[in-house]
């Protein structure tokens, strides 16, 4: 389907539902699903407010003024999602897409020192030729590693990926005591210490608990991402 009715767009998209017609920009096929992404044009126009109209947003994007994860993107429908790094080339402003309790996903300004760093959650692993291990990440990225390195990284772990050097900078295993953020669902944006898990037959549906001070939130394993040990490894708020 080429078009998307505004009434069928994800509820958290910051678009005018009643003004400007019935159609919204539909994200193109890419690293994030429709449910958990924003088209680049919506980011430029409705989130960052660099444009007032879709036409203006398309012009800005077509000029190569927007980078996503260090790559110039000229497709105004390109899907922007969790932990993506968005750079406004003319101004040098850099943002990261992070979970937010109020907005679901929001773009937070980050320092230039973090522009090349992107947390990636491991969604699966595959054995490939030569005994090597291929990791599959939440943004559709894949990375092949030597057997000794690949075996140490498990599904649901997080790696901090260096976008410039295309290499893993830090490995954050999923284990009790780690700091995690809720990435989907009713508790989205909550950051706390991962202190409890109740395993179920379907591992992704296992119930986990995060604690921040006296506050405890519960969600499912599929909805959390490890982001550090005592503090987040990148800025998320």
From Swiss-Prot:
Pfam family for this entry, one: S4
Domain S4 RNA-binding: start-end pairs: 38-110
CDD domains according to UniProt: S4 (cd00165)
Keyword Ribonucleoprotein part of the UniProt annotation: yes
GO molecular function: rRNA binding; structural constituent of ribosome
Keyword list, A-Z: Ribonucleoprotein, Ribosomal protein, RNA-binding, rRNA-binding
BP-aspect Gene Ontology terms: translation
UniProt xrefs under PROSITE patterns: S4
Cellular component, GO, one term: cytosolic small ribosomal subunit
Similarity section: Belongs to the eukaryotic ribosomal protein eS4 family.
Name of this chain's protein: Small ribosomal subunit protein eS4
